[in-house]
Amino acid sequence: MARMICAVKRKYWVPSQSKPPKKTLCIIGDSHLGSVKRALDAGLVDLAGFDTELWGAQGPAFRQLNLIDGAYRAQSPQAVEAVLQINGQGRAHVAPGDFDIFLFYGARLRMAEFMPPMLHHMALPNGAISRAVLAAATERFVRGTRAARVAMHFAGAGARVYFAPTPLFTDGVIDFEKARWAVRDFPLAWAADAPQRAPLWQALADTFAAAGVGFVPQPEDTICRGVFTKANYAPEGALDARDVVHKSPEFAAVMMRAFLAGLN
């Protein structure tokens, strides 16, 4: 009888070519989200490693967002409409478990209300303050902002959360010495340098860290004249609109890169 030889196919393990799932990122904010979107659309910052959604509202509608039943929700039909327009994904509310990472951007935590008075006071002849007093003042300022409290709640619920504050006013748009802006009342702050600002940035970071939130300070190389953002970061049309608050897509890209660096 002829011998029959059967060829046996050996199975070899082949590593999967599928990529790991992207992390999900939600950027929560107010009108400053506009510069983030323009930066993303222009390819100024790379978020290819994330499935990203924007969430928030502009103007008065942002004040109608609140923490209700454990989620950040709009409290009026107008605010719901504003949120859905910005989000574009039909997400009317966000909860701590909805995303891998949250970044609160701008969100009314205004550095122009914190830095000038603090730096001015610290520059007075008898203006030195203790670390404990600085910590208490910083915590009072941070917790006075609703979005910061929401960020802390999310972190307390187990979410990975970061906060990038509203940046300092833009230089070169108006004459701050003549304009009716509170920053003109703190002239000593205008001479502050990076070492003088450092304790304030650290106090902000410490306050957020105590609640489990990462803090993204405004990069020092974007700051000039003590308490101002450099003029080249003004958005298009800022001079005509006298807009010292909002920033360009290039500035948003700088902040987003700082945020991404902090993730690593």
Question: Which positions does each model-derived feature cover?
Answer:
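Basic, amphipathic N-terminal segments that precede the first structured/catalytic domain
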Residues: 2-97
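Short catalytic/ligand-binding loop motif for oxyanion handling, primarily in non-cytosolic enzymes
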Residues: 34-37, 61-64, 110-115, 169-175, ...
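Short amphipathic alpha-helices and their capping/turn segments at secondary-structure boundaries
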Residues: 38, 82-103, 146-158, 207
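Surface-exposed cleft-lining segments at the edges of enzyme active sites
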Residues: 118-148, 182-195
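Acidic carboxylate-rich catalytic motifs and surrounding loops in phosphoryl-/glycosyl-chemistry enzymes
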Residues: 165-167, 210-230
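Substrate-gating cap/lid alpha-helix
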Residues: 173-218, 244
